[in-house]
Amino acid sequence: MRLSLSVLLCLGLALTLAQHNPHWWGNRNTIVHLFEWKWTDIADKCERFLGPRGYAGVQVSPANENIISEGRPWWERYQPISYKLVTRSGNELEFASMVKRCNDVGVRIYVDVLLNHMSADFEGLATGTGGSVAEPAKKSFPSVPYTADDFHETCEITDWNDRFQVQQCELVGLKDLNQNRDWVRTKLIEFLDHLIELGVAGFRVDAAKHMASEDLSFIYSSVRDLNINHGFPNNARPFIYQEVIDHGHETVTREEYNELGAVTEFRFSEEIGKAFRGNNALKWLQSWGTDWGFLSSGQALTFVDNHDNQRDSGDVLNYKSPKQYKMATAFHLAYPYGISRVMSSFGFDDRDQAPPQDAQEQLISPEFDADGGCTNGWICEHRWRQIYNMVEFKNTVRDTELTNWWDNGDNQIAFCRGSKGFIAINNNLYNLSETLQTCLPAGEYCDVISGSLVDGACTGKSVSVDGNGYGYIHIGTEDFDGVLAIHTDAKL
C-alpha cells in the first residue's frame, strides 16, 4: 500500500510539473495574445511574421461556439453555448489548419478555454455562432447537452471573501457548471482532448479561481497527452496557465492552483504599470520577481496588460500610453522573470466595444501600413519594432543571468544579461548620458529599439563597446523611446 501511494504521488507530481512546460521550439520564449483574430489570419502571420520574428506561441480567443450578442461585443466569446469549434474567428477546419501551419513553423497554439460556465441569461432562445440554440435562463444547452442538473444552484457573488460564493455562484450571471459532476467532467475532458488532437500545445483556463482546484486537478490529469503528429514528444502534457486574480487579500488564492500549472500573475501587471507611470521609482525593480511577492518564475504567466485589465482604469498600462508601454514591455522581456506574454489589441473607446467588423458583423482582417503596423482598427503591439525586437533580445539572452545592475537612484536603470545583452531605460525628465558596463565583447552594436539590423547596417542608433565592455549610453528626453537595447545578435 505504501509503495502504491508513493507511485501515485510521484505520478501526480510528474503530471503537474509537466503542465508547466510550454513546449517551445529552440530558444523561443514569448507568447503573443492575438485577441479576436481570425484563424486564417493567424496561420498566415505564423508563417510570415511570428515564426521569422521568433515568437514562441499564440494565445487564441475561445474556439468553441458562443452566443450571438447584440452589437457583437468582445465578451460574447466568453459566453459559450456548445463545444462546436465554430466562432467568428472561423470553423473547425480553419482552426485545424491554423494549428498545423503554426506548429510547422515552430509557433505553438494555446487556446483560451471556458470550463467554468456557459452563457448568461438571454431573453428567449439564444442562437450561437454555429447555429446551436439554447435557453440559458433554464440552463438548457442541448448541443452539449447540459441541463439544469449540470449546474450549481443559481446565486449571485456578493461577498468575494466567501469561498462558496466565489466557486459555486454565478460570475456576472454566467451559468455556473458543476465540475464535480461526472457528466460535466466528461464533456469538458472531451472538449480539451479534441483540441489536443488537433495539435494545440496547451490552454489558458479562464476564471480558474471560480472552480475548485481539486476539480481542475481531476480534469487536467484526465486529458490526453499532446499529439506527437504535431511535433510533440511522447508523453508530453499540455501547458496550462490559469486565470487567478489574486491581489494578496483573496480567500481563494493563486497558491491553490500553481501546482496544477502556471498562474496569471496579475500583481506583475499592476506593479509594472505603477513603476512606468512614475508612481514607483525604477531603481526598486532590481529585486523584481519573488521579492515583490510574485510567484516563482516558472509558475508565473507575466504580462503588462491583458484583454480585461487594459480596459480598466488605474495603474495598468495599455497601448494608449505608447512610450511608457514600450518601456514597460522592454523591461518585461529583458528581466529574467516569468513566462512572458505580450498583448495584441484592437482599438477601443469603451469597454464593451466589438473588434473590427464589417456591416455584416464579420471580423475584418488587419491590414498593414508601409512600416508594417496594423490598420483597420487593429493595434498589433506585437508588430511594433520596439516589441518584436525585444522578443529577439529575449531569445538571444535566454538562460543568462542578470548582472551589473546600475541605477541613478531614481528612474534611470541599466543591466546586462550575461555577456549577450544590455538594456538601459530612462523614465526621468532629464537625459541619461553615462558610460556604462554593457558586458558585451568589443564592437559596434545596433540599438534594437530605435532601429533594426538590416543587411549588416543599423537603421537606428548604434553603441560602440570598448575592450573592457564599456559603452557610452545616451537616452535623451527628446528621444521617441525611453529605452536602448543591444545584444550579440545585433552586432554590426
Curated annotation (Swiss-Prot):
It holds the Pfam family Alpha-amylase_C. Binds 1 Ca(2+) ion per subunit. Binds 1 Cl(-) ion per subunit. The modification Pyrrolidone carboxylic acid is found at residue 19. The keyword Amino-acid biosynthesis does not apply. It is found in: Secreted. Its main location: secreted. It is an enzyme of class 3 (hydrolase). Chloride binds at residues 204, 306, 341. InterPro entries: A-amylase/branching_C, A-amylase_C, Alpha_amylase, Glyco_hydro_13_cat_dom, Glyco_hydro_b, Glycoside_hydrolase_SF. One of its GO terms (cellular component) is extracellular region. Keywords: Calcium, Carbohydrate metabolism, Chloride, Disulfide bond, Glycosidase, Hydrolase, Metal-binding, Pyrrolidone carboxylic acid, Secreted, Signal. Residues 1-18 form the signal peptide. Ca(2+) binds at residues 116, 167, 176, 210. Monomer. This is Alpha-amylase-related protein. It comes from Drosophila willistoni. The lineage of its organism: Eukaryota, Metazoa, Ecdysozoa, Arthropoda, Hexapoda. The gene is Amyrel.
